[in-house]
Amino acid sequence: MQGNMYLNISQVIKAFSIVALGSISASAIFMIVVLFFKTVSACEAFFGILSAASGFVIGAYIPISQFSNEVQTVCNLFPASQITIMLRNILLNGLLDHINTSLQGVDQGMFVLSLKEYFTFQAKLFKGYLDMNKMLEYILGVILFCIVAQIMIYSGSYKKN
């Protein structure tokens, strides 16, 4: 096998942790959404449409950076977008550092910088940017909010008689 590995064990653990965090945040959000459906078929239809649209929202089909500032802000309000950005940072930063080193300063780092801008390595939110720590705080805040909302909704909907 040829080639180099640009991920260390710490980055692999971080990547798995981010995927787990993404699963938890999606579950927390959609547990609230599911409460409003009366039938399984309506829920399935909604999530079928949502799964197609979510590729655009998280930047899987088209990088979020290609949209207007307003659309970027709306997309980055969803934790899944930030999870995607965090995962992209963890998985590609080592490779991009290697590319930058290989170019030996010929372009003063502009190639890697333009790749990071094009492929959205920071979440743009209301004319500002969120770094990795701010994205993590935001996602954890959304999870906490959703859990509290679920407790309130469930306790109001399913009171004991």
Predicted segments, located by residue:
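Alpha-helical transmembrane segments and their short interhelical loops
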Residues: 1-54
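Transmembrane helix segments
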Residues: 37-95
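Junction motif at the cytosolic side of a transmembrane helix
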Residues: 102-161
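Transmembrane helix-loop junctions in multipass membrane proteins, especially transporters and channels
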Residues: 2-6, 31, 35-39, 63-68, ...
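Hydrophobic alpha-helical membrane-embedded or membrane-associated segments
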Residues: 22, 77-80, 141-146
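Membrane-interface interhelical loops and short interface/amphipathic helices
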Residues: 86-87, 92-111
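Hydrophobic alpha-helical transmembrane segments of multi-pass membrane proteins
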Residues: 16-20, 71-74, 140
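Membrane-embedded alpha-helical segments of multi-pass transporters/permeases
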Residues: 27, 56, 60, 147-155
